[in-house]
């Protein structure tokens, strides 16, 4: 059979017989017509006999008559839309060596926040379009034909033709501009070797502010006109982060400039394009008067994360998407390192346990996936930008750093960056460098964590002076998987002075423990008689203690003998073990009682999350007890909340500001009348006078949620007042606060109204997930009925994986019965797509886990008695 273009269909990757060396691209975006045209001249190296050039193109019209390779005219130019490729065939084999491929093409500036797209903004009261790119993972092919895989690194030289009054930015600095009346041509310097997914273009009206690093690299923050002041905080973090990373990686920042731009419509949080980082507004802008402390923290972490990518991801790039975690896990881990250095008072490494927790919760599902995951089609890539690649990735890096030691680890990373700069690497390449530098068996240890999904629970049992350990794969459904890990075990006994460290290589092991240090003079067991495994939660695993060890830790928590990280680890492990039916809800409630005098934000953020989880399940599991359980949880949080009150105090810490917000929101969600009434009272004052300081940004969300708890169809003034604020504010953070409150109403008709409001032009598509995230238990049936009715529209409007997955997760995961799981499965039968298939399976698994947990709670003999006892104790 003669070779034909058909042979290239259905392949995971492009053929390797030709590869690009450099691209010379000219693009003309037409912002009024929402279209663009372009031409490409690509220097190509042909390395093996072939008569075809195969590259990626999607939603582009390639002009076949314009295509040339050197002076050869192709015999055929065929586009396969489903495979997102264009195949250019010639009458004979192409000469081995270098040649230039030329072609013209046209496309649409879409409204789907991927490829080359348009974003709406207001200028002087009128709506305008800006042109923006978002190419990760596989969408550069929607802007120009290219070899759209990370390993095909090339140099890029761009030329843009744009309206002369607009700012036009790309990865590299401008060489020159020539103006021809209403249009100008902008020429950019050629980039170093880079992957296609990092190419970027932004064209629109902007203000900017500027700073520079110690090396003299110019850093700018671009914002909508009039908002540049809100870029100051991010600029400061960016300049300091670049200096810090230069030292940490022992390699200078690779480009001549760095621009950061706030984009009004943006699907992700931010994107690390080389030298031109794009952000949604809430992730870059910070306003002293209008932003909350948690917004400030989010900006710092996001900026540090994206700038870490300039080394880890951009300079050294993963060879294929299987190794995505090398990009994301490292950028997440290193962003905490930077923010800890810049803001030590934020206690950032303790807050890092938020990441570890979300990684552990997702990875306890049978429908999780390994850190290194096989990718066979571009449509599968988006779905792995999840808590496994980011949070588990970052957590196993922290575990490895803790095992090897910070200095050795840093030295090895610097060697890795030097070795693979301007090139690509696989996970094994990193292990090889770390192994060489440290002399430790890194590859054997880490392969168990990256190539198999899941993680272990370590069962710990004390027998005299011997501590017996046994590992088994932990799954939230209560079963044990087949996994076996090499586990870095750390332990301390009675104090943090003498810690033991060793590797658990098999299923079981035992350790000799010296208990004398932890006993009172008389030999009896006091508050120092405790043994804690996984010290400071550096390991990515859970621990199930026997009753004696658990009692010792409970005493130690009450006596405040444990570190913040260990207090977090114990309550998180206990909650997850309860969900998996490995311990009772009764014992979890007793443990929570030990935290009643806790006042630290980092610990209480985990305690409140556990409280809200218990509250949700108890409504379905024990309706007759749920009021009492609510009261118990309220009592647990109340003293810390009363100490802080509603009003900020002079000179209080950043973490106390965050704690106030956290506790008030939790008390409102738990239905605490006093907090709800106070939130409503303050809201009424606030809507009469927006300049009042009775509701600063940090307590606004609690107040808005309180208002929505009192709204009904017949008494809806609060809902309408919130909508009015939404329509009048220009601040993205304030808009997101309101959207997250509207759907939390207990009245089903109002929930429906909020969901329908989300479909209007008044809500940007990127912001839908705020509304979805706010849905109350009372609104779950309405939300599910709404999703079924609007599914086709939703699928068309939100094609991006992360956003469509939010719709599925938010509506499905709140259910708790096998019948509901069956109903959901039936609805989606024949409707699933790779972009949300994993999210659907995980959501259904969560429903079934809840159903089993409920069954188990109903059969607990002492639950009512314990709840009663603990309530009596509170009186």
UniProtKB/Swiss-Prot annotation:
What general EC class does the enzyme of this chain belong to? hydrolase
Q: Where is this region: Required for membrane association?
A: 96-203
Quaternary structure and interacting proteins, as annotated: Homodimer.
Give the EC number: 3.4.11.2
Tell me where the signal peptide lies.
none
Tell me what reaction this enzyme catalyses: Release of an N-terminal amino acid, Xaa-|-Yaa- from a peptide, amide or arylamide. Xaa is preferably Ala, but may be most amino acids including Pro (slow action). When a terminal hydrophobic residue is followed by a prolyl residue, the two may be released as an intact Xaa-Pro dipeptide
Q: How does it sit in the membrane?
A: Peripheral membrane protein
Query: Lineage in the entry?
Result: Eukaryota, Viridiplantae, Streptophyta, Embryophyta, Tracheophyta
Per UniProt, the keywords (alphabetical) are: Aminopeptidase, Cytoplasm, Endoplasmic reticulum, Hydrolase, Membrane, Metal-binding, Metalloprotease, Microsome, Protease, Zinc
Any notes on this protein's domains? Dileucine motif seems to be involved in protein-protein interactions.
Instruction: Give the organism the record lists.
Output: Oryza sativa subsp. japonica (Rice)
Presence of the UniProt keyword Hydrolase in the record: yes
Q: Where is this motif: Dileucine internalization motif?
A: 722-723
| Similarity comment: family membership | Belongs to the peptidase M1 family.
Predominant location category: membrane
Entry superkingdom: Eukaryota
Q: What is this protein called?
A: Aminopeptidase M1-B
* Bound cofactor: record note: Binds 1 zinc ion per subunit.
**Annotated site (Transition state stabilizer):** 390
């Amino acid at each position: 059979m003669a070779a034909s273009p058909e042979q290239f269909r259905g392949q995971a990757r492009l053929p390797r017989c030709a590869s690009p060396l450099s691209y010379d691209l000219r693009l003309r975006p037409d912002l009024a017509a929402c279209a663009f045209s372009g031409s490409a001249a690509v220097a190509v190296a042909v390395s093996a006999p072939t008569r075809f050039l195969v590259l990626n193109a999607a939603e582009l019209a390639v002009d076949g008559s314009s295509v040339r390779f050197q002076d050869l005219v192709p015999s055929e130019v065929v586009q396969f839309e489903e495979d997102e490729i264009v195949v250019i065939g010639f009458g004979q084999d192409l000469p081995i060596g270098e040649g230039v491929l030329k072609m013209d093409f046209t496309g649409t500036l879409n409204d789907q926040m991927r490829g080359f797209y348009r974003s709406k903004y207001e200028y002087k009261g009128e709506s305008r379009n800006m042109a923006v790119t978002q190419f990760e993972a596989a969408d550069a092919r929607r802007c120009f034909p290219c070899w759209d895989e990370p390993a095909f690194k090339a140099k890029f030289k761009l030329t843009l033709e744009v309206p002369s009054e607009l700012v036009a930015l790309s990865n590299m600095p401008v060489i020159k501009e020539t103006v021809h009346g209403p249009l100008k041509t902008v020429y950019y310097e050629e980039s170093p070797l880079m992957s296609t997914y990092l190419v970027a273009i932004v064209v629109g009206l902007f203000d900017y502010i500027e700073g520079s690093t110690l090396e003299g690299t110019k850093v700018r923050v671009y914002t909508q006109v009039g908002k540049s002041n809100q870029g100051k905080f991010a600029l400061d973090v960016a300049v300091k982060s670049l200096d810090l990373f230069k030292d940490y990686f022992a390699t200078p920042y690779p480009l001549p400039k760095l621009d950061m731009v706030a984009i009004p419509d943006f699907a992700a949080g931010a994107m690390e394009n080389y030298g031109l980082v794009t952000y949604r507004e809430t992730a870059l802008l910070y306003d002293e008067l209008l932003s909350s402390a948690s917004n400030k923290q989010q900006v710092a972490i996001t900026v540090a994360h994206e700038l870490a990518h300039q080394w880890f991801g951009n300079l050294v790039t993963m060879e294929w998407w299987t190794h995505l975690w090398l990009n994301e896990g490292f950028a997440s881990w290193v962003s905490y390192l930077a923010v800890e250095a810049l803001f030590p008072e934020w206690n950032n490494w303790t807050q890092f346990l938020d990441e570890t927790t979300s990684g552990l919760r997702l990875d306890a599902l049978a429908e999780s996936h390994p850190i290194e995951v096989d990718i066979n089609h571009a449509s599968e890539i988006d779905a792995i930008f999840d808590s496994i690649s980011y949070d588990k990735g970052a957590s196993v890096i922290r575990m490895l750093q803790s095992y090897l030691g910070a200095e050795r680890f840093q030295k090895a990373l610097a060697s890795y960056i030097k070795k693979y700069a301007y090139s690509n690497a696989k996970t094994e390449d990193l292990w090889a460098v770390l192994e060489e530098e440290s002399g430790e068996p890194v590859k054997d240890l880490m392969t168990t964590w990256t190539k198999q999904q899941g993680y272990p629970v370590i069962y710990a049992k004390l027998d005299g002076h011997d501590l017996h350990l046994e590992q088994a794969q932990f799954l939230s459904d209560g079963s044990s998987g087949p996994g076996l890990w090499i586990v870095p075990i750390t332990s301390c006994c009675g104090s943090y002075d003498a810690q033991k460290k060793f590797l658990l290589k098999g299923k079981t092991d035992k350790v000799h423990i010296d208990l004398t240090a932890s006993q009172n003079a008389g030999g009896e067991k006091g508050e120092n008689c405790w043994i804690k495994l996984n010290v400071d939660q550096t390991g990515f695993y859970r621990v199930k203690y026997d009753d004696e060890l658990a009692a010792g830790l409970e005493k130690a928590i009450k006596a405040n003998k444990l570190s913040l990280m260990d207090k977090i680890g114990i309550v998180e492990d206990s909650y997850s073990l309860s969900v998996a039916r490995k311990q009772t809800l009764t014992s979890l409630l007793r443990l929570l009682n030990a935290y009643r005098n806790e006042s630290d934000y980092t610990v209480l953020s985990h305690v409140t999350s556990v409280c809200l989880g218990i509250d949700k399940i108890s409504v379905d599991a024990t309706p007759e007890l749920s009021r009492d359980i609510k009261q118990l949880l309220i009592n647990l949080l109340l003293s810390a909340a009363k100490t802080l009150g509603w009003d900020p105090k002079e000179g209080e810490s950043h973490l106390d500001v965050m704690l106030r917000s956290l506790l008030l929101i939790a008390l409102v969600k738990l239905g605490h009348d006093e907090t709800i009434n106070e939130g409503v009272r303050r809201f009424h004052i606030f809507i009469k006078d927006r300049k009042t300081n009775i509701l600063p940004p940090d307590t606004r969300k609690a107040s808005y949620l309180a208002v929505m708890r009192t709204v009904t169809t017949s008494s809806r003034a609060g809902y309408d007042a919130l909508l009015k604020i939404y329509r009048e504010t220009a601040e993205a953070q304030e808009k997101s606060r309101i959207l997250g409150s509207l759907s939390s109403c207990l009245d089903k008709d109002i929930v429906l109204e909020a969901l329908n409001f989300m479909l209007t032009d008044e809500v940007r598509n990127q912001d839908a997930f705020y509304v979805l995230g706010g849905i109350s238990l009372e609104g779950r049936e309405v939300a599910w009925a709404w999703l079924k009715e609007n599914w086709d529209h939703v699928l068309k409007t939100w094609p991006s994986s992360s956003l469509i997955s939010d719709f599925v997760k938010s509506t499905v995961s709140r259910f708790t019965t096998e019948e509901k799981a069956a109903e959901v499965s039936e609805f989606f039968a024949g409707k699933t797509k790779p972009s949300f298939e994993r999210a659907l399976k995980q959501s259904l698994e969560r429903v079934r886990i809840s159903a089993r947990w409920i069954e188990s709670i109903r059969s607990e003999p002492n639950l009512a008695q314990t709840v009663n006892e603990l309530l009596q104790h509170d009186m």
